[in-house]
Amino acid sequence: MLVTVDDGVALEVVVTGSGPALFLVHGFGGAKEDFSDHIEDLSREYRVVVFDHRGHGESGAPTDEASYSLERLGADILCVADALGVDTFVLLGHSMGGMVARKVALTNPDRIDGLILMDTCHGPIAAVDGDLIEMGAQIALTDGMTTLKEILDAGTPLDNPAYQRLLEERPGYREFQEKKFGSLSAVMWATLVRAIRDQSDDLEAMRSLEMPTLVIVGEVDLPFVSQSRAMADAIPGAVLAVIPDAGHSPQFENADAWAVAVKSFLLASSVS
């Protein structure tokens, strides 16, 4: 279904199951289907909400840069919750979705029953080359997403055996990745990739978080492992789950271990 948020952008939202609300928020360049392997299972006990961020998938794609920021994406989450009549919820954010989730938790802690930060960070990522980010943003805006994809495809493959295994062994996974990229807005890409590069470091502020928190990361997702450990150390009572044989998308790369970590946290936190 479509939910129109407060600035007029329509977001494609899918709700499955009943019970306590659980929002699963995808990352940069992702889609609501990034959690498709787990929705049926989780929806047995939870009201699972997934949606495409603006500029992604089946959601609206504003053409102005002012419509894209990490804070705006956070506002979208709250707008969707309000439209569904959900006062409080567990919030899981993956990658950029985790950056957004941490900001929602910091600014609206009363809305968050539990927080799951997945393969994400507390601030700028040291491994990210700011000049390359700017080059990619300019290419997206001036030459288009097709040209950008050709350049990205010609680059060095990700050093992630788990991801390569998915591409080789999971039927349709490569096509799934291609479809997601094909839906992306150039303005979104350029604006949000800069926002990710320039984000604030919220580690000290995260020490004030009081909701139950799980920090989850694939063991070979090297840009995010150290920041995940730092967040788990900073947030009072936080649990750290390092998923073996997984990189940036452990919900696909080691689905069973990911599901155990998430469901164990939900049960232990009495979010049921």
Language-model-derived ranges and their functions:
Residues A246-A259:
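Catalytic histidine-centered segment of alpha/beta-hydrolase-like enzymes
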